[in-house]
From Swiss-Prot:
Single Gene Ontology MF annotation: DNA binding
Protein encoded by which gene: A2-A3
Keyword terms of this UniProt record: DNA-binding, Early protein
Name the record gives this protein: Protein A2-A3
Assembly mode: Interacts with A1 protein; the two proteins form heterooligomers.
Originating species: Escherichia phage Bf23
General function of this protein: Involved, together with A1 protein, in the second step transfer (SST) which allows the completion of viral DNA into the host cell.
Family: Belongs to the T5likevirus A2 protein family.
Taxonomy of the source species: Viruses, Duplodnaviria, Heunggongvirae, Uroviricota, Caudoviricetes
Disulfide partners: none
C-alpha cells in the first residue's frame, strides 16, 4: 500500500492580530463571567476562536502579552481528605500501647487494610478521632 501524503493543514502561529483578539476576549470573559471561568472554559473558547492548536498555549500567550491574571484561590489537586489510614492506625496503636494492650505498633499494622470509613468509626468509638485529625495536620 502506497503512502499518500495529503495536503497539510495550515499551522497556527500567534501574530499581533490573533494575540490582540485573545486579549480582548479574555478581558471580556473576565468582566462577564469572572476570573475562574475565564481561566478554565474561557481559555478553551479563546483557543477555538483564534484557531490555536491547543488551549494550553493561550495562557502563556496572554502572560507574554501581560494580560493573564492568576486566580486568587489555589486550585485543589486531587480529592478527599488528607487523613490517611496510617494516621488512624498510629493513633489507635499509640493508645493500645499506652494501655498495655499491645507491645508494638506492628501488632495493629493489618488495620491499614480496613476501609478509611471503618477506621474513622473505630476512632470515634475510642474517642480519638480529634487526635487523628491533629496527627494529620488538619
Amino acid at each position: 500500500m502506497a503512502n499518500v501524503k495529503t495536503e497539510k493543514s495550515a499551522k497556527f502561529a500567534w501574530n499581533e492580530e490573533n494575540t490582540q483578539q485573545a486579549v480582548t476576549m479574555y478581558q471580556q470573559l473576565i468582566n462577564e463571567n469572572g476570573l475562574e471561568f475565564a481561566n478554565s472554559d474561557g481559555l478553551k473558547e479563546i483557543a477555538k476562536t483564534v484557531g490555536a492548536a491547543s488551549p494550553v498555549s493561550v495562557p502563556s500567550k496572554l502572560t507574554s502579552a501581560k494580560a493573564y491574571q492568576k486566580s486568587d484561590k489555589p486550585r485543589k489537586v486531587g480529592g478527599g481528605s488528607s487523613i490517611r489510614k496510617a494516621h488512624y492506625v498510629r493513633v489507635i496503636a499509640k493508645h493500645a500501647i499506652d494501655s498495655g494492650i499491645i507491645k508494638d505498633a506492628d501488632d495493629l499494622a493489618s488495620l491499614e487494610s480496613a476501609k478509611l470509613e471503618t477506621l474513622d468509626a473505630v476512632a470515634q468509638l475510642l474517642g480519638v478521632a480529634d487526635e487523628v485529625k491533629q496527627a494529620a495536620g488538619e
